[in-house]
């Protein structure tokens, strides 16, 4: 029997999560052969070379923390020649009882999704029909909506395909496209993080005026972050329970604010991971939250 997949919100207690260690293969971040999407993304985020062994060591710190907190950590098999394989958040999204396989925007990342079909994992990923959509752009702020950021990696067609697939599988949720006012956005989760019921970190400057109004109307407490904090990927936190959030070491102001909101804040050194724009949320793919 397949293991249950169920994720209702961003902040349910984390019980089962997939991760994948960084591989030794890396891609050039500068030069004439850099993809135009990456060139645009460099305007809104910081990209520097990283040491894969150091990334793996920092991932092991997070794995230990999650296991100590009662989560089962499933390690996905390697994806050869995939420099971003340690960001499994992008390859799928769990919405309620269904795991949807992402439609990745970059050709070189496509092999990353193969691990979802490993029979030992007990997963039954559902394919979407069109467009592009990556898990870093998909958020579950509550039990009735799915936010989908229209970043460089996710298209309106991808968001529409998710809405159609939800209906086919009996998931009664509204897909809400999230609009940015600038090009070059890597993913929504570098600029918005739902950390508790009705509470989110937000980098307001990248969203349209209408989008900010929508956030104001649908969240009880929006905590603004600075441009520097967003560039340092400090928004990309991981809620592991309704009152517990993991943040990257060095996110001092954010840590203080979250603690003042009554949250337990745990820290992990992720300084090597964040040398390209991904952090705690990016390196985890929740499969079961309660």
Predicted regions mapped to residue ranges:
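The feature marks the mature, well-folded catalytic cores of soluble enzymes
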Residues: 1-290
């Amino acid at each position: 029997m397949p293991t249950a997949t169920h994720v209702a919100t961003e902040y349910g207690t984390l019980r089962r999560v997939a991760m994948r260690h960084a591989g030794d293969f890396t891609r050039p971040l500068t030069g004439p052969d850099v993809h135009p999407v990456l060139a645009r993304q460099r305007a809104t985020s910081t990209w520097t070379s990283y040491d894969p062994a150091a990334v793996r060591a920092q991932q092991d710190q997070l794995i230990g923390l999650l296991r100590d907190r009662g989560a089962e950590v499933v390690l996905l098999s390697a994806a050869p020649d995939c420099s971003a394989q340690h960001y499994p958040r992008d390859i799928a999204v769990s919405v309620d009882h269904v795991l949807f396989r992402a439609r990745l925007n970059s050709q070189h990342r496509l092999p990353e999704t193969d691990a979802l079909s490993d029979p030992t994992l007990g997963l039954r990923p559902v394919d979407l029909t069109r467009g592009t959509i990556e898990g870093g752009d998909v958020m579950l702020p509550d039990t009735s909506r799915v936010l989908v950021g229209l970043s460089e990696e996710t298209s309106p067609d991808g968001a529409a395909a998710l809405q159609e697939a939800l209906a086919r599988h009996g998931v009664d949720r509204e897909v809400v496209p999230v609009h940015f006012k600038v090009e070059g956005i890597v993913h929504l989760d570098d600029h918005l993080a739902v950390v508790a019921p009705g509470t989110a970190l937000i980098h307001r400057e990248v969203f349209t005026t209408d989008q900010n109004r929508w956030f104001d109307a649908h969240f009880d407490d929006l905590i603004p972050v600075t441009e520097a904090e967003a560039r340092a990927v400090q928004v990309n936190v991981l809620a592991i329970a309704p009152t517990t959030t993991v943040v990257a070491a060095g996110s001092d102001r954010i840590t203080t604010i979250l603690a003042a909101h009554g949250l337990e804040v745990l820290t992990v050194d992720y300084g090597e991971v964040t040398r390209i724009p991904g952090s705690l949320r990016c390196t985890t793919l929740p499969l079961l939250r309660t």
